[in-house]
Amino acid sequence: MLIRGCIFDYGGTLDTAGRHWGRVLWDGYVRHGVPVDEAAFRDAYVFAERRLGSCPIIRPDDTFRTTLDKKLALELGFLSSGERAYISEKDAAKFRKDILDDIYEGVKQTTAESRKVLKAVKARFPMVLVSNFYGNIGTVLGEFWLDGLFDSVIESAAVGVRKPDPAIFRLGVEALGLLPEETVVVGDSYDKDIVPACQAGCRAVWLKGEGWDERQYDESLPDAVITELGQVLNVGWL
């Protein structure tokens, strides 16, 4: 059956070119010389993600820059507190600003490139965004000039369903008004995008980038595997 609509993931797909956010942040720590090892960083990253997911820290009107700043504040606060503090609070404040400016600039560049691809896809098909986010995805899309490209936005914080539950992709299919087999999902996370998209009956294109770990995946599950977002335009049936 022909593809008639597309569902895109946001985080890791449109803003970091397929790289897991943990990798993006860790590289920022390394570039700016934060004196912690990767194991300590991973503990801080997981701590911050859990806090952001369970507490109303992010406001609906928070830009991505503000969101990233709050994330870094949690991570570096974790690393500069307690008996095993790795850095001083003064150093944490400086690292926070420097890493924020660095990574935010990279995200601006990546989303600008993603916008070109999305505009090309939109010329062919209706598009829906399906994202696990903090309740401010609308603000973030506007910040990076991505608003108006999607016919609908399905955000986990708004609908009460999170990936990897296939139900969130079914909501995306319903928003398109199509059948699952007429819909292709494009995402960077094998476990949170590709597997549940296939379980929902959709076609799937995996943006394979630098993951959180070095696991091996069954690349026969997605219908196509790409390493750059722009390659989605060259998938034969898209």
Question: What annotation goes with each model-predicted range?
Answer:
Residues 122:
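Short conserved AdoMet
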Residues 1-4, 39, 82-84, 90, ...:
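Asp-based, Mg2+/Mn2+-dependent phosphohydrolase catalytic module
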Residues 1-115, 138:
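N-terminal helical cap/lid subdomain that shapes the substrate entry/recognition surface
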Residues 125:
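Switch/coupling loops of ABC transporter nucleotide-binding domains
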